[in-house]
Amino acid sequence: MKVLLHCQRLRFIWLAKPAGRHFHRDSQLWAPLTLDDFEAINRCEKPLPKNFNFAADVLDQWSLKEKSGERPANPALWWVNGKGDEVKWSFQELGSLSRKAANVLTKPCGLQRGDRVAVILPRIPEWWLINVACMRTGLVFMPGTIQLTRKDILYRLQASKAKCIVASEEVAPAVDSIVSECPSLKTKLLVSPHHWDGWLNFQELLQSASEEHNCVETGSQEPMAIYFTSGTTGSPKMAQHSQGSLGIGYTLCGRYWLDLTSSDIMWNMSDTGWIKAAIGSVFSTWLRGACVFVHRMAQFDTDIFLDTLTTYPITTLCSAPTVYRMLVQKDLKRYQFKRLRHCLTGGEPLNPEVLEQWKMQTGLELYEGYGQTEVGIICANRKGEAIKPGSMGKGVVPYDVQIIDENGNILPSGKEGEIALRLKSDRPFCFFSEYVDNPEKTDATIRRNFYVTGDRGVMDDDGYFWFVGRADDVIISSGYRIGPFEVESALIEHPAVVESAVVSSPDPIRGEVVKAFIVLAAPYKCSNREKLTAELQDHVKNSTAPYKYPRKVEFVQELPKTITGKIKRNVLRDQEWGRA
């Protein structure tokens, strides 16, 4: 494949000024930022550059290293689907194709810098192309899982005022059914070999697009992406991240938690709709010049998963605890993993038993990390440090992680409280910028001089953090964040339901699952409970993303409530977890 490279490197220089040093590009003394520079910025040893663009300042630099022989012959992206199809792109090929994709977005799609683009695609190579193309053009990338329903998509398009949606055939019918209710939406771009009435065809436009494209010089704190994050009340919030928070903020994660080099091949199992895909399948991995490996499976299968680890030279694996719980039930000693050396997990608490079984069968440690959509990785178990089974590890640079009480006072070790990040004079650049159009929720994350995560935990005498529970009642099942309000809202639409309360319930495979406590309407109180349970579960699957449906249902006469009438979910949750 012919690749056209930029003739001119994007470079920076330090300029001393009375107000403090900053980066400036208008000088013949420019020099490209290096990994050491990015690490120094993360440690607050150097200021954030005024301008930064991940495509130009990271990906294109790896293209140049690749061309000059300074990088191993390792793909930038390696995609397979188990059916014989395979895609391998070098950084140079990724650069060329993403420039063509950038021209598709700006010319036939008519998008301009700052426009928001909803992207609902499965794990296909085009997801990465669109992602990088948005970086090159200064568009705001908004990913979503293909499990989103019509109602979910409608909310996201209306709330974000998206100008464009990029989607696959699985999603196109749902989009067409609500497009008349989305006045901001101007363009529908289909990623498919087939044509669809009213949609532009990405593959067709990509073939004819020019490889010549000048990358937009974006500001470091300019919006780059928006992630919809679930909460316990109201609709999902829009957490906005900047070019710098994502593009530079995951440098230390790539080195110290993922332990990546440019020779590594990283397989991150996260769905494309979540920020974990950005962490492990874009920023942390490509900052280190490593290869992103992707296997698109129609559905998760332990045998296919293990065969993949055996067949391909994957060095680094990151997946939800649910996957490891399923894997340790197999005889792993039968498998010979070619190069696997580093295994990670996150997204929900990991059972100590699974960690121990994984090590016993594979000889490999399992390094757990804890983070949030808003601020990235907060705690992690890292190589070179002792692992305490069940612990989330220690706080990571640049964060000062503390346990605080409701008044913002730091609690001593061994005392349960809220997990919080102590702030200095300035808000860390690796934080999310804001909840879009929701200043109250944004402000509510700060208590005195702390960012409060909404999660509860304990720090031991050695500085290790232990997860206790979510203060905001969000359920994490198989790595998916599920807001109880969304499930309750779906249930209440069914005529059998008077009211409901949704909480987490322990599950040996998924860690926790959604459980609904339901008060029935009078006409349904004598119904067949088994049939009604199945009917309600199907109702939720059809009303919202299927992974949110309650796997457990209990019918009750009444729900526990406070004196003001608020449902006491904590009582029900404690009952489920045996802590009542």
From Swiss-Prot:
The catalytic activity of this protein is classed by the Enzyme Commission as: 6.2.1.2
Q: Which GO terms describe its cellular component?
A: mitochondrion
Coiled-coil segments: none
Q: Which UniProt keywords apply?
A: ATP-binding, Fatty acid metabolism, Ligase, Lipid metabolism, Magnesium, Metal-binding, Mitochondrion, Nucleotide-binding, Transit peptide
| GO annotation, biological process | acyl-CoA metabolic process; fatty acid metabolic process
- This protein's superkingdom? Eukaryota
- Transit peptide, from-to: 1-22
Catalytic activity annotation: a medium-chain fatty acid + ATP + CoA = a medium-chain fatty acyl-CoA + AMP + diphosphate; hexanoate + ATP + CoA = hexanoyl-CoA + AMP + diphosphate; octanoate + ATP + CoA = octanoyl-CoA + AMP + diphosphate; decanoate + ATP + CoA = decanoyl-CoA + AMP + diphosphate
Q: What positions does the entry give for ATP binding?
A: 229-237, 368-373, 455, 470, 566
Q: Which co-factors does it depend on?
A: Mg(2+); Mn(2+)
Function statement:
Catalyzes the activation of fatty acids by CoA to produce an acyl-CoA, the first step in fatty acid metabolism. Capable of activating medium-chain fatty acids with a preference for C6-12 fatty acids.
- PANTHER family named in the record: ACYL-COENZYME A SYNTHETASE, ACYL-COENZYME A SYNTHETASE ACSM4, MITOCHONDRIAL
Q: What is this protein called?
A: Acyl-coenzyme A synthetase ACSM4, mitochondrial
Supply the source organism for this entry: Mus musculus (Mouse)
